[in-house]
């Protein structure tokens, strides 16, 4: 039987503990769980993977910190951390582990106490100075309120341990945007083996940031994803008066997990010459096997939109209203298999738009939709690291989803028509890596039995186990995607291009060279390095992309593009910023009208594997 008494003894007697550099050693909690799960839990372990480089690096850093130059000393203090500071060391695991295995040893035990252990953004182990920058940021940062963490728990004192529910809850905590990491540790009471104490460890992220868009629509924004430690999100955006765009201001506030209901409520209000918005939406996702999903959206939007088929911008005005509800029935409490049903309705009315007709720009037609879906779903999680992150524990879903959907649409230009779709998803870890497969097909049809605006989309994603190459860890990634459009119309959203998810990186396709069918294959070999500069980690990668885009349904007979290159991604898991990506490429083959950009610096969101959870019933997107 599992015994977590060591972890229990290291936790202070009070229910809430805030870790500082002179307080509790948080590594004890992580080490204890690591020993039980065979997964090193990312953020609190000393880095033992690179002993030679750590020793050499420490000598260099010590020399730099003792330099006579005040500039060198300042840089060493601000930017460089030795392995002693690396309390979230990049500890690797070459295999995925099922997240619920750790909790199965405690199944049926009664929870007698729930403790919360919190760490500030840059808090270190005892005796380790985070440096003046870390101390300053921790002092400025407002720690997440304890009640915010507790209302994200799916269990209470007096409940019995359910391994599946606990693993779902741990993943839920780690997915919160204001936490750098979170995990759950269970310890038995010394004299009462059927009673346990549950300890929640959570380390905050630095959640204040800024961003913007400098192409097409120009704006800058500042946001806080943990406003005043409440877990809510605040975003303020200013639209710059450049070109045809006028001054504009927009504010967004999101109440996350509103009053502990796991419902997120978002309010958006904006005013300006070309951007006016008033919108409110609320949504509650599926979380547990037997659960509800519901939501609504209502609002008015006026915004400049770039047209895909013409070199012009049109000020779009629209009102939209949507409502959805669903329920899932648990068929297997141990594995989380569910049968679910879903209902949704949506109305969109356009006041200003491009020209529309029976076969032109159906995307901008006023429509009323009613849809229903049902299916089977199962989702569990593996835990690993150095996949899409840079050392923190990552939750990779595995399972399946099979869904049938259908409905009715009234369109001002097409009249009454019907819709049907089929979705099949599957993902799991095999002997030599993880594979995720997806297939979707859907189409409208009219009372005259004519099929229209059909789409078929298939995809496959693979990543290999983690290999060690000297002091570097290597993982191989492959992604394939193919999309066919059938009986499409003319105008906006009726053709497709390369996108951020289905891309040949660096290739630019002009408007006159898009198509209805597309296939892409992306390959990456990623090298996770031991380079560590004040929690910024570096991953270098070799990449190659091929793509086909055109109107031929024999998809590999369409115009062909091929690119190879190298790049580096830089990520600080403690900060809310996206990855910084620097990429170089060479085009091996591209059609004459295509553009190519051999160099790019960008912000890149961390990729995620498709979820198998039930979702809102809606037509399959053609994108």
List the model feature ranges, each with a label:
Residues 6-8, 48-65, 402-408, 415-623:
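C-terminal transmembrane beta-barrel domains of outer membrane proteins
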Residues 248-251, 277-283, 295-297, 306-312, ...:
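Outer-membrane beta-barrel translocator domains and adjoining extracellular loop/strand segments
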Residues 121-123, 207, 239-243, 256-258, ...:
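Sequence/structural signature of outer-membrane beta-barrel proteins
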Residues 9-221, 237-239, 248-252, 273-279, ...:
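Periplasmic polypeptide-binding modules associated with outer-membrane biogenesis and secretion
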Residues 153, 202-242, 249-255, 261-273, ...:
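Transmembrane beta-strand segments that form the barrel wall of outer-membrane beta-barrel proteins
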Residues 214-218, 245-249, 274-278, 315-323, ...:
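Residues that define the transmembrane beta-barrel architecture of outer-membrane proteins
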Residues 110, 194-196, 206-208, 230-234, ...:
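Outer-envelope beta-barrel architecture signal
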Residues 255-362, 366:
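Transmembrane beta-barrel wall of Gram-negative outer-membrane proteins
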């Amino acid at each position: 039987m599992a015994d977590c008494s060591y972890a229990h003894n290291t936790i202070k007697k009070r229910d809430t503990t805030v870790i500082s550099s002179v307080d509790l050693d948080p590594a004890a909690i992580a080490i204890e769980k690591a020993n039980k799960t065979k997964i090193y839990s990312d953020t609190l372990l000393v880095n033992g993977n690179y002993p030679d480089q750590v020793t050499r690096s420490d000598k260099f850093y010590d020399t730099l910190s003792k330099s006579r130059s005040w500039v060198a000393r300042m840089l060493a203090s601000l930017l460089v951390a030795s392995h002693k500071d690396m309390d979230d060391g990049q500890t690797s695991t070459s295999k995925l582990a099922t997240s619920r295995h750790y909790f199965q040893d405690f199944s049926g035990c009664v929870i007698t106490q729930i403790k919360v252990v919190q760490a500030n953004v840059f808090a270190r182990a005892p005796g380790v100075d985070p440096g003046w920058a870390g101390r300053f940021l921790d002092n400025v940062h407002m720690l997440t309120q304890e009640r915010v963490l507790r209302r994200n728990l799916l269990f209470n004192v007096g409940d019995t341990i359910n391994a599946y529910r606990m693993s779902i809850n741990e993943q839920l905590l780690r997915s919160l945007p204001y936490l750098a990491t979170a995990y759950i540790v269970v310890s038995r009471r010394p004299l009462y083996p059927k009673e346990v104490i549950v300890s929640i460890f959570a380390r905050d992220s630095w959640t204040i940031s800024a961003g913007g868009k400098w192409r097409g629509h120009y704006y800058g924004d500042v946001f806080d994803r943990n406003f005043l430690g409440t877990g809510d999100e605040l975003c303020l955006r200013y639209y710059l008066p450049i070109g045809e765009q006028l001054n504009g201001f927009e504010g967004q506030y999101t109440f996350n997990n509103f009053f502990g209901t796991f419902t997120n409520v978002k309010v958006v209000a904006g005013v300006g010459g070309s951007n006016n918005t008033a919108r409110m939406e609320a949504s509650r996702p599926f979380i547990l096997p037997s659960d509800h999903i519901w939501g609504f959206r209502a609002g008015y939007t006026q915004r400049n939109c770039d047209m895909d088929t013409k070199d012009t911008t049109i000020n779009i005005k629209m009102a939209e209203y949507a409502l959805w509800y669903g329920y899932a029935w648990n068929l297997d409490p141990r594995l989380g298999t569910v049968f679910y049903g879903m209902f949704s309705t949506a109305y969109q009315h356009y006041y200003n738009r491009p020209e529309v007709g029976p076969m032109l720009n159906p995307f901008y037609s006023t429509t009323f939709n009613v849809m229903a879906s049902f299916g089977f779903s199962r989702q569990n999680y593996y835990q690993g690291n150095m996949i899409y992150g840079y050392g923190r524990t990552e939750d990779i879903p595995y399972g399946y989803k099979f869904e049938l959907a259908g409905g009715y649409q009234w369109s001002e230009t097409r009249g009454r028509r019907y819709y049907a779709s089929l979705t099949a998803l599957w993902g799991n870890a095999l002997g030599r890596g993880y594979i995720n497969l997806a297939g979707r097909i859907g189409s409208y049809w009219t009372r005259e039995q004519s099929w229209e605006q059909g789409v078929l989309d298939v995809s496959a994603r693979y990543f290999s186990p983690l290999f060690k190459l000297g002091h570097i860890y290597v993982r191989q990634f492959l992604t394939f995607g193919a999309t066919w459009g059938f009986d499409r119309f003319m105008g906006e959203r009726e053709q497709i291009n390369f996108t951020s998810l289905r891309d040949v990186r660096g290739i630019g396709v002009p408007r006159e060279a898009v198509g209805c069918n597309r296939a892409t294959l992306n390959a990456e070999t990623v090298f996770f390095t031991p380079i560590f500069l004040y929690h910024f980690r570096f991953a270098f990668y070799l990449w190659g992309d091929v793509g086909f885009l055109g109107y031929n349904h024999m998809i590999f007979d369409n115009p062909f593009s091929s690119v190879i290159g190298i790049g580096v991604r830089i990520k600080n898991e403690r900060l809310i910023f996206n990855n910084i990506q620097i990429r170089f490429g060479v085009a091996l083959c591209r059609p004459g009208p295509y553009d190519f950009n051999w160099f790019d610096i960008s912000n890149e969101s961390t990729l995620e594997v498709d979820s198998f959870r039930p979702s809102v019933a809606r037509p399959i997107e053609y994108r």
